[in-house]
């Protein structure tokens, strides 16, 4: 196929209208090799149903999936790479297609402030890839992607809990920080989460009706103990001790009042 034909707009339009499957396929591969993924993808999309049963079909489908990836159509590339490795599980491209599905989903993962459904899907596919290809040459890159996605979920979980705290929804904040600590025990946000959980519990107790205060102050005292055990050198230690002292004083007063009433 002539370079002149590939390089001209009229030549490309003629290829689109052509019914010569072999000529179209040859042109699509040449466009692909030149890095013109839009034209290659357009031709390959037309060719795929026409190549069924032919040896070129496998390469055409893999290349078509990659044209979508190279054009940053990550949702589509994830779909087509999955379709490829499901259709050709024994292909020489199968492992790379599985990897590229995972990479497409990784690229399609949104900022942490947004819904993270795609992130969870990406992590699931990455784990499936590692289970299937434990010795893969892509292993280090895939593990790096997984760690980055986990950090994104970690940040979302922490900022979500922090938002409850900032909005003064203290009960929800305590619940969210507890879930965060359980889900991410080694998080770099751990110290801040533990302190804000204590602070939220103290404020919750302080703002509670009288018959719930003692129980909630005692919970704040328990959170203080956990905090100083885990972070004895914390820069927030002085403020934590202040809340502890106030909680302890409040509990002692309530106990004294209860004894006097009896």
Question: Model segments located where?
Answer:
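Acidic, polar-rich low-complexity tracts and alpha-helical solenoid repeat scaffolds
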Residues: 5-262
């Amino acid at each position: 196929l002539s370079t002149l034909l590939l390089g001209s707009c009229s030549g490309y339009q003629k290829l689109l209208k052509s019914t010569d499957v072999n000529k179209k396929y040859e042109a699509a591969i040449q466009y692909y090799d030149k890095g013109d993924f839009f034209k290659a993808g357009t031709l390959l999309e037309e060719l795929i149903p026409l190549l069924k049963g032919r040896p070129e079909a496998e390469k055409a489908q893999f290349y078509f999936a990659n044209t979508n990836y190279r054009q940053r159509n990550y949702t589509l590339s994830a779909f087509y790479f999955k379709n490829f490795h499901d259709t050709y599980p024994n292909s020489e491209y199968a492992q790379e297609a599985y990897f590229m599905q995972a990479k497409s989903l990784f690229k399609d993962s949104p900022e942490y402030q947004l819904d993270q459904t795609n992130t969870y899907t990406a992590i699931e596919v990455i784990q499936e890839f590692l289970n299937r290809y434990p010795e893969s040459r892509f292993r280090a890159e895939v593990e790096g992607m997984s760690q980055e996605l986990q950090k994104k979920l970690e940040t979302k979980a922490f900022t979500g809990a922090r938002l409850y705290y900032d909005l003064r929804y203290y009960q929800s904040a305590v619940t969210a920080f507890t879930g965060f600590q359980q889900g991410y025990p080694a998080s770099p946000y751990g110290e801040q989460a533990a302190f804000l959980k204590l602070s939220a519990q103290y404020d919750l107790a302080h703002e509670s009706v009288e018959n719930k205060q003692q129980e909630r102050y005692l919970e704040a005292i328990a959170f203080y103990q956990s905090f100083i055990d885990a972070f004895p050198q914390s820069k927030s230690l002085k403020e934590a001790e202040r809340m502890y002292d106030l909680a302890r004083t409040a509990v002692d007063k309530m106990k004294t009042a209860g004894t006097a009433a009896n």
